Amino acid sequence: MMKINLYKLLCFICVIFLLHKNVVRSGDNMKYNDMKGLDDLSKLNDDQVKDILGLKIDGAKERIEKLFHLIDKNNDKEITEEELNTWSSFLKNEIFLKQVQAEMGQIDSDKDGFISLNELNDAFAQNLDAKEVEKHSEGLLKRFQIVDKDKDGKLSINEVGLLIDPMKDEELKELEINEILEHHDVNKDGKISLDEFKQTRSDESSGVKKDDEMALDDFNFFDANKDGFIDKEEIIKVYFDPAHESGAINVNEIKENIFEGKKITYDLWNEKALKIAVTSLTDYGDVIRYPEDFKLDIGKNVILPTARSRAFEDDDMDADNTEDDKDEADDASQQKSPAIDEL
C-alpha cells in the first residue's frame, strides 16, 4: 500500500492524473457506492457474516447498535444530518491519521520520528529503474521543500500529512494542478482538448498509450461541463473532491438508499443494521471489525477467519522450518563433534 500511495501522491503529471482516476472510478468502486455487491449483508447467514466482519450476526448488530449511540450526540434517539457530518469528519481524520502513521513507519528507516529527503527518495525509488527515479527527482524535491514548513530539512508527521493530502496545502495543490496541465496541455492555452489528452495519455505501468475509446471515457469523466475541454476548475473538482477522501460519507446517498429518505431513528437504524455494516458509515466494515483502531468503545478488534487461517498456516510452516533446521543441525553435529579444547 505504501508504494502505491507514494507513486500516486509523489509522482506528478500523468501518473497522478491516471491513478486518481483509477481510485475514483475503477479500483475502489464499492468505496464510493454504498449499496453495491455485498454491501447489504442482510441476506447472508451467520458464517458468511463472520467471514466478512469477524463476528456473527448478533455480535455485529450489537456493535452497530452501540455505534448509533456514539453518533447520536444529543441522545434523542435520532441521527441528524449534522450528526452524520460530524461522524464523517471524525472518520476522515482517524483514517487519515492512520494512513500518515503507516507511511511514516514505512519511510522513516532510521526511526527518528522524521522523514529526511534521502529516506523519501529511497522509498520512492523502490521498484523503479534509475531513469524513472531521475525523471521524478526534481518534482519530489519540490514537494519536500514545500511541505517542510519549518525548513529544518526533515518532515514531521504533520508535514508528511500535507504530502499525502495536497488539498491541505495551497502551494502543493497549485503545483499538482500545474503539472497536470503542463503535461497534457500541449498548445499551452490553459486547457486540455481531447486530442491533447489522447496524445499525452498513457498507461502508468507500461507507458503504452491507451486506445481512443478508453481515452474518451477517461476524458469525459473529467470534462464535467461537456464543452470538449478539461480546464483547471474541472481538475480541481475531480482531483480534490472531498467526497473522494478516505472516510468520506455520502450523506444523501446513505439517507436515500439505506434509510429511504426517512428520519434515522434508533429503531430504523437497528432494523437496517446489516445494510449499514459495510458502508461508508463504518469505513466499509473496519469500524465494526477494528473499533479499537478508531478509539471507539464498542468492542475489541477481531481476527477475521481468513487471517486466522493464514496465521495457522504460517505457524505450521515455521514449525516445519524449525524441525528442518533442527535436523540439519543434528546432522552437522554428528559430522563433527568439537573436542573439549575446541570449545
Swiss-Prot record:
Binding site for Ca(2+) 5: D223, N225, D227, E234
Locations listed in the record: Endoplasmic reticulum
Positions annotated to bind Ca(2+) 2: D108, D110, D112, E119
Record's protein name: Endoplasmic reticulum-resident calcium binding protein
Keyword field contains Calcium: yes
The organism's place on the tree of life at top rank: Eukaryota
Organism this protein belongs to: Plasmodium falciparum (isolate 3D7)
Alphabetical list of PROSITE patterns matching this protein: EF_HAND_1, EF_HAND_2
Higher taxonomy: Eukaryota, Sar, Alveolata, Apicomplexa, Aconoidasida
Similarity comment: family membership: Belongs to the CREC family.
Signal peptide (from-to): 1-26
GO annotation (BP), single: intracellular protein transport
GO molecular function: calcium ion binding
Reported consequences of knocking out the gene: Conditional knockdown results in inhibition of the asexual growth of parasites. Defects in the conversion of schizonts into rings. Defects in parasite egress from host cells. Defects in the breakdown of the parasitophorous vacuole membrane. Reduction in the proteolytic processing of apical membrane antigen 1 (AMA-1) during egress. Reduction in the proteolytic processing of subtilisin-like protease 1 (SUB1) from the p54 form to the p47 form. Reduction in the proteolytic processing of plasmepsin X (PMX) from p67 to the p45 form.
A single GO cellular-component term on record: endoplasmic reticulum
EF-hand domain sequence ranges: 59-94, 95-130, 135-170, 172-207, 210-245
